[in-house]
């Protein structure tokens, strides 16, 4: 996890594509479920929308 990307996300400075990449990295590492609740909810929403996939699943 890159803390600078987290900060950029929280400040609204990431593009939509970069946000999806960030959340996929958080999902793959399991960190999405360890951070504050917003991250897990957002990760689940992105998975449900088909923009991200569950850890271990092919793209």
At which residue positions do the language-model features occur?
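Catalytic phosphate/metal-binding cores of nucleic-acid and nucleotide-processing enzymes, i.e., regions
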Residues: 1-59
